[in-house]
Amino acid sequence: MATAMYLEHYLDSIENLPCELQRNFQLMRELDQRTEDKKAEIDILAAEYISTVKTLSSAQRVEHLQKIQSAYSKCKEYSDDKVQLAMQTYEMVDKHIRRLDADLARFEADLKDRMDGSDFESTGARSLKKGRSQKEKRSSRGRGRRTSEEDTPKKKKHKSGSEFTDSILSVHPSDVLDMPVDPNEPTYCLCHQVSYGEMIGCDNPDCPIEWFHFACVDLTTKPKGKWFCPRCVQEKRKKK
């Protein structure tokens, strides 16, 4: 029930994602078109300048070159806007992916705890059944063949149920949630895994890893001031 409710909430949270992505992609296409139009305008202005440069006065040359420079500046502005929009789009999708990764990790841990608890209860139940069965055997001695035959199906039924329970409990939670990983998704941290949950960046600009999961570096909250990863701290000590 809780899983179904979570799925419903998660689907609600990404309901507007396709529309937002479509809007951003449309804006990027428009910026592309504006850039191409500006580049065509620059080509025309450059051709005009080259063909008339000998007949233009100094003031006219400066004015013409300023038009070309202005067109170049506008073209760069469109390109910068497109890059910024692409980064926003990536962050928007990555936010949902990181949330899903974190929720899946919590769900897997919760599932493992529940199955461990079920395994403990099942072991106790089997011990109780075994003791009860031995007691029934002692009390049924001398009752005759008919009583013994009537007990046989019940014993088989208990055995079958126990085997079924064992087969369920033998399934590892990670097998249930085992999903293929995108080979193109970048990996981070000392664990070389994809980004998920809370992460912190190393303040060493030359750090080869850059980003780390809180749990992998024994953090629960973001520390104040600059923070350096264990590898960079160790390298710094070696240099001393």
From Swiss-Prot:
Subcellular location: Nucleus; Chromosome
SUPFAM superfamilies per record: FYVE/PHD zinc finger
Annotated PROSITE patterns: ZF_PHD_1 (PS01359), ZF_PHD_2 (PS50016)
Protein origin, superkingdom: Eukaryota
Organism: Mus musculus (Mouse)
UniProt name for this protein: Inhibitor of growth protein 5
Keywords on record: Activator, Chromatin regulator, Chromosome, Metal-binding, Methylation, Nucleus, Phosphoprotein, Transcription, Transcription regulation, Zinc, Zinc-finger
CDD domains: ING_ING5, PHD_ING5
Source lineage: Eukaryota, Metazoa, Chordata, Craniata, Vertebrata
Chain positions covered by the region annotation Disordered: 115-165
